Curated annotation (Swiss-Prot):
It is an enzyme of class 2 (transferase). One of its GO terms (biological process) is inositol metabolic process. The gene is Ip6k1. It catalyses: 1D-myo-inositol hexakisphosphate + ATP = 5-diphospho-1D-myo-inositol 1,2,3,4,6-pentakisphosphate + ADP; 1-diphospho-1D-myo-inositol 2,3,4,5,6-pentakisphosphate + ATP + H(+) = 1,5-bis(diphospho)-1D-myo-inositol 2,3,4,6-tetrakisphosphate + ADP. Residues 139-149 have a biased composition (Polar residues). This is Inositol hexakisphosphate kinase 1. Residues 113-123 have a biased composition (Basic residues). Residues 150-160 have a biased composition (Basic and acidic residues). It comes from Mus musculus (Mouse). It is found in: Cytoplasm; Nucleus.
Amino acid sequence: MCVCQTMEVGQYGKNASRAGDRGVLLEPFIHQVGGHSSMMRYDDHTVCKPLISREQRFYESLPPEMKEFTPEYKGVVSVCFEGDSDGYINLVAYPYVESETVEQDDTPEREQPRRKHSRRSLHRSGSGSDHKEEKASLSFETSESSQEAKSPKVELHSHSDVPFQMLDSNSGLSSEKISYNPWSLRCHKQQLSRMRSESKDRKLYKFLLLENVVHHFKYPCVLDLKMGTRQHGDDASAEKAARQMRKCEQSTSATLGVRVCGMQVYQLDTGHYLCRNKYYGRGLSIEGFRNALYQYLHNGLDLRRDLFEPILSKLRGLKAVLERQASYRFYSSSLLVIYDGKECRSELRLKHVDMGLPEVPPPCGPSTSPSSTSLEAGPSSPPKVDVRMIDFAHSTFKGFRDDPTVHDGPDRGYVFGLENLISIMEQMRDENQ
């Protein structure tokens, strides 16, 4: 068993799933739409990801005015594999103790050599979450012949009331419905495979604890945007730098300073999330990027015009903050745009469509009929939106970790991307008034 069994456990977060009397059973974060490291759910308000020391130090060094636009940094946990009574292996988090010998992932996943996936069966188990759509846990068991298979055998048992579907960018056809974002499953399988192959001695791994920025949203619609005109860090090898520059040149990263890295948007007409991944985003033209943004703001029945001003206000605020951050560079970082896919106005619209009635514009509020008093927002309540910067494994600024390269002025590539994103949204708003 894992060497961290004897550690004392501190306070658990709200609705954290306990593993025996000691650790917290980690579950896949079902709303992950992009990235390459698997995000794990620690509790309702907290997620965790493999620790990269540069990213940890960056969170610890954030300027105060940037904290509004980044997830709250909550510390570090030790993570290891543990078996349960059914023979499955789970990822379990324990309080981090400074004296422990732990592994941390200072080499981003895409730089690591490819490994054969061990054959395994993924098993879902329930959690203690209050949110039905988040009742999912993945674990795996190995077989004697597991080393020969190149990809895992997946067994899914749905626990979600809200299915996800990946839309194919070529055919326009949807994949089968599953109970969490397909990209989340992909990242989690890769993470387990890599950690499993490296954990013959039951090593401990360090994971960052971060705020779950979608926990305020009932039906989180998430757009993951890779920001900036450059994606490689100052310490990248010549080979990797060339590879990243090609990706930028062949996508809207070069022309707009921003490209789609993933998204999920709740569709009122079907009751499921429509999903896109980074490969879709890489192939978009400027017009294709506009169309993707339009799709992100469309709920299957209507364009969410009420979202334009709240999102634009957040983006303008972020731009103003970043323009004041001299020497900062956020290479390969992403920007999350989030809103709730099922709010009062949308529910009223869906009700009238279902009943074949004409659309009634007045939203619910104090003066509405009793039949609509259970709906959430009032007429003066703007829709809830959020904008957060994430992924700082390649970020730098003057004096950070004695980095030899020091840059002048703000991150102009990132600001360029924000300017274009704001401009496109303003044009879309004006065209759809």
